[in-house]
């Protein structure tokens, strides 16, 4: 069958690479795709924006697309799934009403409270003065979040009152995130270890993907600004078998059942960004309605099952008929970013040193990369993600670092400590 993947990042390159391996996939189209997806076997880019829903629907009808997988959040929040379903097309992702779990942080916090799902204490604000009063009552450290979508950058972890007040003013009166910041959520700072827990949902059945841990801060030792993610590894040792079952019981099933009870049946990938507290309790920091980026890259390297089959079963409400199979090795991905990211960054620098041919257990997934006159040049903040499998997280990390060193362009940078928590655990054994 023909398959369509919507999006143009490193995550979509990883999804396209995995989908193309399926015997069920004759041809894989990526809209709009990037220079990485263009190079994959059986894969073709289509020049349609990820948010141009009428054009995507028409393309899917013209090419007789048997399955569509949505990569990024923006099309989900504006209703791409609803439009495809109305046209009788099979698509894996949540409908617009269910995608509010990512589209509005205030919606999510209120939903969690209604269903007694553990999360940080919080309040929502649309006016500056009441928000400032609340900040002064609660003290720091404290977290200020823009309500809507802000490409992973709308969260400020404020260590001083001044930082917190500036964030509130920037969002509510300074319009730092436009419409996304017209309402803010202020919540308590949770001190634990973060983990990404991604599952597939068919409305009622849930199939967990491998656990992972992302690294949000731009600098080593988790310093500097928040980003969309500077690297990730899988599995995350903080998620022990016991904590895994707690997450399913206390977070995932109550969320899926709660959404269904409220008339927003959830299908698609559901990504719970969690804080694992020192006592082992998982608390929800955020939900995303899609696979994470960069978590997808190391997770896809470990997935042994046919992703197309999993998605088709999920679309048909039959996820209980399949169990995903995973490589027991660890995988780790390091993002190589353009100078200046996550603020204003340079574009157009020529990239050299990319592997000429496929290497077993290693893969470079391209993201912000364009082709110009036969050369690959930087075209985004997060340019690519070097990913490797290893017998341990340390081994995967060392392989990925070696791969990263070979790839060059002017001003490129990356974190050399991705996976440090897991590596420390391994060294203590």
From Swiss-Prot:
Record key words, sorted: ATP-binding, Ligase, Magnesium, Manganese, Metal-binding, Nucleotide-binding, Purine biosynthesis
Residue sites binding Mg(2+) per the record: 286, 288
Catalytic activity of the protein: 5-phospho-beta-D-ribosylamine + glycine + ATP = N(1)-(5-phospho-beta-D-ribosyl)glycinamide + ADP + phosphate + H(+)
GO BP terms in the entry: 'de novo' IMP biosynthetic process; purine nucleobase biosynthetic process
EC number: 6.3.4.13
Keyword Translocase set for record: no
Residue span(s) of domain ATP-grasp: 109-316
Keyword Ion transport attributed: no
Biological or metabolic pathway of the protein: Purine metabolism; IMP biosynthesis via de novo pathway; N(1)-(5-phospho-D-ribosyl)glycinamide from 5-phospho-alpha-D-ribose 1-diphosphate: step 2/2
Superkingdom of the organism of origin: Bacteria
An annotated Gene Ontology molecular function: phosphoribosylamine-glycine ligase activity
Binding-site positions, ATP: 135-196
Known cofactor(s): Mg(2+); Mn(2+)
Bound cofactor: record note: Binds 1 Mg(2+) or Mn(2+) ion per subunit.
Entries under NCBIfam families matching the protein: purD (TIGR00877)
Family note: Belongs to the GARS family.
Stated name of the protein: Phosphoribosylamine--glycine ligase
Protein's organism: Haemophilus influenzae (strain ATCC 51907 / DSM 11121 / KW20 / Rd)
């Amino acid at each position: 069958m023909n398959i369509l993947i919507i999006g143009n990042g490193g995550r979509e390159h990883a999804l396209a690479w995995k989908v193309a391996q399926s015997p069920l996939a004759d041809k894989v189209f990526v809209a709009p795709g990037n220079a990485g997806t263009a190079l994959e076997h059986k894969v073709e880019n289509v020049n349609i924006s990820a948010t141009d829903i009428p054009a995507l629907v028409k393309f899917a009808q013209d090419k007789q697309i048997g399955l569509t997988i949505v990569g990024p959040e923006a099309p989900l929040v504006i209703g791409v799934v609803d439009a495809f379903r109305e046209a009788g097309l099979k698509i894996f992702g949540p409908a617009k009403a269910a995608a509010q779990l990512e589209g509005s942080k205030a919606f999510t916090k209120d939903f969690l409270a209604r269903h007694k799902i553990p999360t940080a204490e919080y309040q929502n604000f649309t006016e500056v003065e009441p928000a400032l009063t609340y900040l002064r009552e609660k003290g720091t450290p404290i977290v200020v979040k823009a309500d809507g979508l802000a490409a992973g950058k709308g969260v400020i972890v404020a260590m001083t009152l001044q930082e917190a007040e500036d964030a509130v003013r920037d969002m509510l009166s300074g319009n730092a995130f436009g419409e996304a910041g017209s309402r803010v959520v202020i919540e308590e700072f949770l001190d634990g270890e973060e983990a990404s827990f991604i599952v597939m949902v068919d409305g009622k059945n849930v199939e967990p993907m491998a656990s992972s841990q992302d690294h949000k801060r731009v600098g080593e030792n988790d310093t500097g600004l928040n980003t969309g993610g500077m690297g990730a590894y899988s599995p995350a040792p903080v998620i022990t078998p016991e904590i895994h079952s707690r997450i399913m019981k206390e977070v995932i099933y109550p969320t899926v059942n709660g959404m269904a009870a409220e008339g927003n049946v959830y299908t698609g990938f559901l990504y719970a960004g969690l804080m694992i507290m020192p006592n082992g309790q998982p608390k929800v920091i955020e939900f995303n309605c899609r696979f994470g980026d960069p978590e997808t890259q190391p997770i896809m390297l470990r997935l042994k099952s046919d992703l197309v089959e999993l998605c088709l079963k999920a679309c048909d409400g039959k996820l209980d008929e399949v169990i995903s199979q995973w490589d027991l090795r660890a995988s780790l991905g390091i993002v190589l970013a353009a100078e200046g990211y996550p603020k204003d960054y340079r574009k157009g620098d020529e990239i050299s040193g990319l592997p000429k041919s496929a290497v077993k257990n290693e893969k470079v997934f391209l993201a912000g990369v364009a082709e110009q006159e036969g050369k690959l040049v930087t075209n985004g903040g997060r340019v690519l993600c070097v990913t490797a499998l290893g017998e341990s997280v340390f081994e995967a990390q060392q392989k990925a670092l070696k791969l990263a060193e070979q790839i060059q362009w002017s001003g490129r940078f990356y974190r050399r400590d991705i996976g440090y928590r897991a590596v420390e655990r391994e060294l203590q054994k």
